[in-house]
């Protein structure tokens, strides 16, 4: 199999948040969502999907700060990438109020060194996004004066799968499952463009058992996910002592057998896949953080998504249960998981 080198770029930043690149103030939460709260995690999930599909990957902007287009173009043009995907989110109007503009767009530049190939990639990604999400389509368009499209030395596309100024699509920005949908469908589009079969995310049978001494793309993927969970390890594709320690710590923190071996149960937990465990006040871990992210996307205030099921999270769960005709006991079992894990929905304006 040919080795393809895939770059991923996210627009704007979150340390600090890029001024103006945000939704109107969200009701119930009384804060806006910022564009990079969608762009960055979706980029990361796309890179993870590419690793699973045996691509080499390059993160154009690993830092949280906004980075100039010229700096990013310079980085990109040093890499000899097969292609580049940039993640953004659209807006319409003044940005202070919500409106009806909605839907998915993908973009390319006719000034790119490979305009026909860039358009073909934009069309393939667009097709997969339409099939794999519930978003309406706005089409594939050419843009000028966008440096990451026209000034790079590789095939390049930009995708914007929604509008920050549309109330329902604003909520989707911070929905982890919508982020995953966009990332995975974008990877499907890349696979389609490259003529390669796509390896699905949610089947743990696609993930090999890893242990100390393992090497390769799935070790890169493991290390990448661990770093996103706060473990300070080098992402080098080699399962050594530091990766072993991080795996053991992750297993301990999430109620798994702490043997340092990454089998089906550990992969399922790393990916936060169902069946999801019953959680309640006092619990911790990745499933609690996922719950908190889902509640936030549905506009139930709880504080930060820190993976700790405290009183604020319990109050949000009870409110969600009351408003969705569930037993309001503050315990997240199968029925509450089914309701909260839907993509989109939540409180209305």
Residue spans of the language-model regions?
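Conserved hydrophobic/aromatic packing and binding residues within compact polymer-binding modules
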Residues: 247-250, 317
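Acidic, Ser/Thr/Pro/Gly-enriched interdomain connector segments
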Residues: 196-235, 253, 268-307, 346-349
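Second-shell loop/turn segments in exported
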Residues: 28-37, 60-65, 108-115, 169-176, ...
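Active-site-adjacent mobile loop/cap segments within catalytic or ligand-binding domains
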Residues: 2-7, 15-16, 78-79, 84-93, ...
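Active-site-adjacent substrate-binding region
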Residues: 114-141
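Active-site histidine-acidic residue metal-binding/catalytic motifs
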Residues: 1-73, 100-102
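Structural recognition of the beta-strand scaffold that forms the well-ordered cores
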Residues: 3-8, 56-61, 82-87, 105-108, ...
């Amino acid at each position: 199999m040919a080795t393809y080198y895939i770059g991923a770029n996210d627009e704007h930043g979150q340390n600090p948040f890029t001024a103006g690149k945000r939704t109107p103030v969200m009701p119930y939460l009384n804060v806006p969502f910022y564009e990079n709260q969608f762009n960055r995690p979706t980029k990361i999930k796309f890179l993870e999907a590419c690793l699973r599909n045996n691509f080499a990957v390059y993160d154009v902007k690993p830092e949280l700060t906004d980075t100039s287009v010229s700096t990013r173009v310079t980085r990109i043009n040093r890499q000899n990438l097969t292609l580049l995907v940039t993640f953004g989110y659209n807006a319409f109007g003044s940005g202070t109020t919500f409106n009806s503009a909605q839907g998915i767009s993908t973009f390319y530049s006719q000034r790119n060194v490979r305009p026909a190939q860039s358009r073909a990639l934009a069309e393939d990604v667009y097709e997969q996004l339409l099939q794999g999400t519930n978003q309406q389509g706005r089409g594939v368009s050419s843009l000028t004066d966008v440096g990451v499209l026209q000034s790079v030395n590789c095939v390049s596309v930009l995708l914007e799968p929604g509008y920050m100024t549309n109330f329902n699509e604003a909520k989707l920005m911070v929905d982890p499952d919508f982020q995953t949908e966009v990332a995975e469908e974008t990877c499907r589009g890349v696979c389609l463009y490259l003529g390669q079969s796509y390896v699905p995310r949610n089947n743990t049978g696609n993930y090999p058992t890893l242990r100390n001494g393992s090497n390769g793309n799935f070790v890169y993927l493991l290390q990448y996910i661990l770093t996103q969970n706060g473990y300070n390890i080098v992402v080098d594709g080699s399962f050594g002592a530091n990766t072993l320690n991080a795996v053991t710590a992750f297993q301990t923190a999430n109620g798994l057998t702490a043997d340092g071996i990454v089998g089906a149960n550990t992969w399922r937990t790393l990916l936060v896949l169902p069946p999801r465990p019953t959680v309640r006040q006092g619990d911790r871990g990745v499933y609690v953080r996922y719950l908190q992210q889902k509640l936030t996307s549905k506009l139930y205030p709880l504080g930060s998504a820190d993976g700790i099921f405290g009183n604020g999270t319990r109050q949000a769960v009870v409110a969600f249960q009351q408003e969705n005709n569930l037993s309001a006991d503050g315990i997240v079992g199968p029925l509450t998981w089914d309701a909260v894990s839907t993509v989109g929905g939540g409180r209305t304006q």
